[in-house]
Amino acid sequence: MTAVSSAKNRIQANARRRRERWARHFRSDHIATLIVAEAPPSELDRYFYFPTVSTQDSLFRYVARLVLDMEPTRENKRDLLERLREARVYLIDLSPEPLAGAHADFVPRLVRRVRRLDPDRIILVKAPVFDAAYVPLHDAGLPVVNVRVPFPGSGQQRNFEVAFSRALRLRPAIAPSRHTDEGG
């Protein structure tokens, strides 16, 4: 391993730990709505759970606006992250690193992570995430909503609003494998 690649690996590991720390800080004990996005941004200063993000924070802004019915600003992001926690809304990424690989490669780990989080509802954001993860999550008996939600960028903002609002209203089908023989 060269000195350059070693330094790059350290930077990436530090960035991952920072993302994990902030995400844990804003996770509630019980998750009502789990949002699964594609991957964290490659820019190290941007992430859904960072309280200070100066540019390109559209996923956070649209989720906060639709869930909390409040207008997000750069100044109130920390408060809105706390309110999302109180609303039991939590976001994870299909890939824990900025995307490097086929989406399907990350699905088995995603299923395990989602089982541990045990949410009441799962909303998949972005078509490739839906295409890779919907069937495996559903087949695993997890409460995934069958709504394809686009990422709120590149002109898809209005489509995101419509699809995400619909996904929030729908109740996922009760998955048989989540029931015990006694109760279900």
PLM region spans:
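Compositionally biased, intrinsically disordered low-complexity regions enriched in proline and serine
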Residues: F48-F50, E161, T180
